[in-house]
Amino acid sequence: MTDTEKSFKVVLLGEGCVGKTSIVFRYIDNIFNDKHLMTQHAGFFQKHINIGGKRICLTIWDTAGQERFHALGPIYYRGSQGALVVYDITDNDSFIKAKNWIKELKTMLGNDISLCIIGNKCDLEKTRVIPLADAEAYAKSVGAIHYSTSAKLNKGIEELFLDLTRRMILNSSGVVIHSNTNTTGQTTNRSERIPIVPDSDSGNKQPGCCSN
């Protein structure tokens, strides 16, 4: 990060196999791997963008979603300015678990964090089990914005991160970012993917395949 850049920490939460890492890969490097394995550790990615004439460095923390990693969550989202809580629109349990993540976030970080709830895998609309209206109503009830995305089809990803960044800028400085602000000229530096806290038990578990 340069002296003129503003840095924001964003934490990515949700159960395993909802497509969290696929969303980040699509945003950072515009790639999608339908053979992507379940994340077995936490790590972060960085992207540098220009938005509203401001230089922004986003540090996006991707966390493992398995139950045995849940207790580590507070370690990673402490100090975050933004949170993306992801669920799979074809998996009701993932939506229930997303609500648990949000309760925990609210308890620890209060209402100051910019919160987005993401219904991922919208390319599987025919098998949707979470009504969009229900998800949007829940998001509104907790002060969040709901987004529908598909990492596979690259749908809604760019808009999600740009809108989140605008909200974090607004929360941190009070500067109003108008909806007609030109944000299409964003630039990126080489992204960094640095795994941390490796899973010492990963060799004993057969990872699942998670994408979309």
From Swiss-Prot:
Keywords: Cell membrane, GTP-binding, Lipoprotein, Membrane, Nucleotide-binding, Phagocytosis, Prenylation, Protein transport, Transport. A lipid is attached at C209, C210 (S-geranylgeranyl cysteine). Gene3D superfamilies: P-loop containing nucleotide triphosphate hydrolases. It comes from the Eukaryota. Disulfide bonds: none annotated. InterPro entries: P-loop_NTPase, Rab21, Small_GTP-bd, Small_GTPase. GTP binds at residues 14-21, 62-66, 120-123. Residues 201-212 have a biased composition (Polar residues). It is a lipid-anchor. Its main location: membrane. It is found in: Cell membrane. PANTHER family: PTHR47978. This is Ras-related protein Rab-21.
